[in-house]
Amino acid sequence: MAKQVIFNEQARAALKHGVDTLALAVKTTLGPRGRNVAMGKKWGAPSVTHDGVTVAKEVELKDPFQNMGAQLLKEAASKTNDVAGDGTTTATVLAQAMIDEGLKLVAAGANPMIFKRGLDKGREALVARIKEQSITLKSRDEIRQVATISAQDPEIGELLATIMDKIGHDGVVTIEEGKGTTLEYELVEGMQFDRGYISPYFVTDSSRMEAVIDEPYILITDKKISAVNDLLPILEAVLATGKKDLVIIAEDVDGEALATLVVNKMRGTLNALAVKAPGFGDRRKAMLQDIAILTGGTVISEEVGRKLDSAKVQDLGRARRVKSDKDNTVIVEGFGDKQAIQARIRQLKQQIETTTSDYDREKLQERVAKLSGGVAVIKVGAPTEPALKERKARVEDALNATRAAVEEGIVPGGGIALLNAIPALDNVQTQFEEERMALNILRRALEEPLRQLAINAGEDGSVVVNQVRTLQREHNNPNYGFDVMTGKYVDLMQAGIIDPAKVVRTALENAVSVAGIVLTTDALITDAPEPKKNGARTPSMPEEEF
């Protein structure tokens, strides 16, 4: 297929147009005084959002060369969202500022490759300074503040702080669309998996159709149990201990084995519950091992040379309670060794860091949460469909920001962390004039988020930046900044206006990366449009008279 190619000034102008178009749409959403963006669809109501990455994903320009600029800038937002889950608008604002100023210097004859080297040197110094500013997240109040700032909704902030209090920082939080108009949440204590009882005859509470067994022995196997002879040795061993509570987690239980369990349950000889093992294939084996570690049991598997009739009481797990309905089973407070559980959690976290699959990462995080004993479901409600989608996106942003803050700590919000990082550029060693130019552009770009926050709040951006610097010197306090909600200059840390350090760092790194790519691009290649074909006209049908 034929291609079209443009070079030099023409290529840079097309890229700049695409970058500016996307940035203008995205940066209006920055901060609590940012505007919403409505996105039309071919059918149904338009989506309304305040989320930078959602806006960025919607932008596709008609001109293919300009669209390249928009797509490159979109990368800064998308990568920031993938790593930190928030800060996408900040990344876009930073990247546009660097590209805008950098293209002027490239057009004036600066060498873009040396210029990029200067940007990279500056980035390293700035990232180190941001990490120095970071303070470890300590209190519930700080978690609430981070979530409130990200979602721009105190109710969401309070809800997430409450949930984090109850499930811990490793807990899994699932966000669903609710049926009402309010925010609600459910907590699931212990390890839950999506398999219920095999037979309704195991139910102990007929009004709720639940089977609840306190302090049972737990037999864990990846085998299908059909023959009663496989089960008899372990049933006799359990009864010999003086207890009759037994939970069986197996691939399946049917035939004589199931009939024996049900009959003994109904007679009161044995208080049994049989549930299917969770997951499939290798994931099932891993989850059964998780259950074994949590309960202090052993997985009885022929893969390791163990047959079911060789199981002893010492191989069985224990838990304070096991609760099962037709769809789910929950193991509460397993009696497993705490050190073994923590070692398993560390192992899973290492796998999370190395995996490249988003699906695998999500499943591993769920397993960590289940071992940690915390799963929460947030049900987001709103009066209308567009409002529901917009609110759900804000809850997701707030959750991601909270996790990022727990991971790397917090810094002053309102663009101040970036402003305070600027002096770090004074110590960067440069060899060429273009490197010094790059550092000057970084100095200007780092002011841009604060400037844009002020503009969105109806203030003069440059005046606000100068006033913040003056007040920081007067009060000898680097945390002084501009509160866009009140229009006052305050100590942002005391006022609870804080950002996760990971979000600020990731936004800066991705902005510098994308700016470097755009500034060093000198030719653009895209598919040439196909010429319109004049198709043969379809002859009209002759009119007939009836």
Curated annotation (Swiss-Prot):
Secretion signal span: none
Single Gene Ontology MF annotation: ATP binding
UniProt keyword annotations, A-Z: ATP-binding, Chaperone, Cytoplasm, Isomerase, Nucleotide-binding
PROSITE patterns named in the record: CHAPERONINS_CPN60
Binding site for ATP: 29-32, 86-90, 414, 499
Enzyme kind, highest EC tier: isomerase
Predominant place of localization: cytoplasm
GO cellular component: cytoplasm
Catalysis: reaction(s): ATP + H2O + a folded polypeptide = ADP + phosphate + an unfolded polypeptide
GO biological processes: protein refolding
One Pfam family here: Cpn60_TCP1
NCBIfam families: GroEL, PRK00013.1, PRK12849.1, PRK12850.1, PRK12851.1
Subunit composition and interactions: Forms a cylinder of 14 subunits composed of two heptameric rings stacked back-to-back. Interacts with the co-chaperonin GroES.
Family, as annotated: Belongs to the chaperonin (HSP60) family.
Annotated protein name in UniProt: Chaperonin GroEL 1
UniProt source species: Roseiflexus sp. (strain RS-1)
Taxonomic placement: Bacteria, Bacillati, Chloroflexota, Chloroflexia, Chloroflexales
